[in-house]
Amino acid sequence: MQTVSSPKQKLNFGQRLLTLLQNRDFMVSLVLTVVLLILFRVLAIIPLPGIRINESVLDRNSNDFFSLFNLLGGGGLNQLSLFAVGISPYISAQIIMQLLSTDLIPPLSKLVNSGEVGRRKIEMITRIITLPFALVQAFAVIQIATNAGTGSSPISLANSGSEFIAFYIIAMTAGTYMAVFLGDTISKKGVGNGITLLILSGILSQLPQGFIAAYNVLSGIVITLTPQLTAAISFFIYFLAFLVLLFATTFITQATRKIPIQQSGQGLVSEVKTLPYLPIKVNAAGVIPVIFASSIMSIPVTIAQFQPQTESRWFVEDYLSLSTPVGIFLYAVLVILFSFFYSYIQINPERLAKNFEKSGRFIPGIRPGNDTEKHIARVLIRINFIGAPFLTVIAIIPYIVSYFIRLPNSLSLGGTGIIIIVTAVVEFISALRSAATATNYQQLRRNLAIEVQQTAKQDSLEQLQKEAPGIGNLW
């Protein structure tokens, strides 16, 4: 008789992989995801008509505005492609909707608590808000592009007439909605979070070129060794530091503080380990504080580039630029403040306390209601004293390295990119594990049904043999 393994048994990597390969629906979803990501990358490297790329100044690091939106947009900004603005306007709209969906605007707060219908309305409003963001960002990119003659922009337009500018703005805005459509399709019919995977594809596509550029820059460091040995040793240290930061970021991203939860009427539980728990991540705010801080610091510097050489421009470049110690310090302060602020919005202790009270759940030793809210808030503040400084260190490392070494920001370690890489990969692996677990349960159910049928047939045959002992000899 076939034995059925327990569904509680954990699958190893080989078993998960074999289970997924046997799942036809999953393989179709995986192929769809890969095809859409390839389509996104192909369209991201094809410039729009009439674009002239200035290879001599093609430097992602020449402007913080370019660097941030090229990262969030999916890497299409360098070529001024259809996806030049990418999904960064949609991300900005999502962040604003999250902020407004708190108690700031009660109608939006009600929509958040209205289930699937409310979620769809929130998504529709988010896409409407995306439009002005896309138009403004596309216009800003075009303005920088048309001023490429100053040497501050890596791109320029062959024709800067008003009709061409309008065409580019409309095309890049349409590209934003097309990128959002691709991301939604991956999320619904593919594997993983589509928006995150689009951003990840842009970052990974630039990694090889970034490593080569870093090797070339590091080979120029003057050491009393041969140039080849100097470059090899420097790049080995660089790559090793990259891996260390990658693993450290993964550890902090996965680290959680578990708050035990008990259901009313469940009775006393002797061991807290057996209770369900509320997981609060050490880095509950994710990458959003870094995006906020980068945006605030890059806006005045970008505007100053279009101003004449005045005292105000010198002040911005001397004190707000991320290439100066004062600018780096202000950037670090903003990241810490936004980490505490946004993590509180993400967790929302008040809403959690109300939901616990409505569902009859409570934290052992803590009274429901206001005491529960204060307890969750205290826990959140304590873990933020770990998560916020770590996030700040990761965010400022590129600028510190760039300040002390001749390594450009975009080639330095850490920053928004490494956090997005870790977050996207962790989400994708979680999606694979969930799919493998679901497939395993389906197989277990089928095997169990077959075993039940076989057992029923065996029992019926044994019953017949008991009632008529000679029936077995008739066959």
Swiss-Prot record:
Its main location: membrane. GO terms for cellular component: cell envelope Sec protein transport complex; plasma membrane. Belongs to the SecY/SEC61-alpha family. It is a multi-pass membrane protein. InterPro entries: SecY, SecY/SEC61-alpha, SecY_CS, SecY_dom_sf. This is Protein translocase subunit SecY. The keyword Flavoprotein does not apply. The chain crosses the membrane at residues 26-46, 65-87, 128-148, 163-183, 194-214, 232-252, 284-304, 325-345, 385-405, 411-431. GO terms for molecular function: protein transmembrane transporter activity; signal sequence binding. Keywords: Cell membrane, Membrane, Protein transport, Translocation, Transmembrane, Transmembrane helix, Transport. The central subunit of the protein translocation channel SecYEG. Consists of two halves formed by TMs 1-5 and 6-10. These two domains form a lateral gate at the front which open onto the bilayer between TMs 2 and 7, and are clamped together by SecE at the back. The channel is closed by both a pore ring composed of hydrophobic SecY resides and a short helix (helix 2A) on the extracellular side of the membrane which forms a plug. The plug probably moves laterally to allow the channel to open. The ring and the pore may move independently. It comes from the Bacteria. Coiled coil: none annotated. Pfam families: SecY (PF00344). One of its GO terms (biological process) is SRP-dependent cotranslational protein targeting to membrane, translocation. It is found in: Cell membrane. Component of the Sec protein translocase complex. Heterotrimer consisting of SecY, SecE and SecG subunits. The heterotrimers can form oligomers, although 1 heterotrimer is thought to be able to translocate proteins. Interacts with the ribosome. Interacts with SecDF, and other proteins may be involved. Interacts with SecA. NCBIfam families: 3a0501s007. PROSITE patterns: SECY_1 (PS00755), SECY_2 (PS00756). PANTHER family: SECY/SEC61-ALPHA FAMILY MEMBER.
